[in-house]
């Protein structure tokens, strides 16, 4: 059976936190729908009215 490598030294809290500094989640940007003025994601169909790019794509 092969032996796996193990850490030689304990990772400090500072090193651990510096490694995790890029792991934060970001809030998606919400835009106003030009048809119903509800909130929607960019480049997505509006969940309130079903419009995308000025035309109705989904019957809501």
Swiss-Prot record:
Matches recorded under SUPFAM superfamilies: Zn-binding ribosomal proteins (SSF57829)
Presence of keyword Transmembrane helix: no
UniProt keyword annotation of Ribosomal protein present: yes
Pfam families: Ribosomal_L32p
Spans annotated as Disordered: 1-26
Domain of life according to the entry: Bacteria
GO cellular component, one term: large ribosomal subunit
Bias type Basic residues, positions: 1-23
GO BP terms: translation
Alphabetized UniProt keyword annotations: Ribonucleoprotein, Ribosomal protein
Listed InterPro entries: Ribosomal_bL32, Ribosomal_bL32_bact, Ribosomal_zn-bd
Any one GO molecular-function label of the UniProt entry: structural constituent of ribosome
The family this protein is said to belong to: Belongs to the bacterial ribosomal protein bL32 family.
PANTHER family: 50S RIBOSOMAL PROTEIN L32 (PTHR35534), LARGE RIBOSOMAL SUBUNIT PROTEIN BL32 (PTHR35534:SF1)
Name of protein: Large ribosomal subunit protein bL32
Organism of derivation: Deinococcus deserti (strain DSM 17065 / CIP 109153 / LMG 22923 / VCD115)
């Amino acid at each position: 059976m092969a032996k796996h490598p193990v850490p030689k030294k304990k990772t400090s809290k500072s090193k651990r936190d510096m490694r995790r500094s890029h792991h934060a989640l970001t809030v998606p940007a919400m835009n106003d729908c030009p048809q119903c003025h509800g909130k929607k994601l960019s480049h997505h169909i509006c969940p309130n009215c079903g419009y995308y790019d000025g035309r109705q794509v989904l019957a809501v």
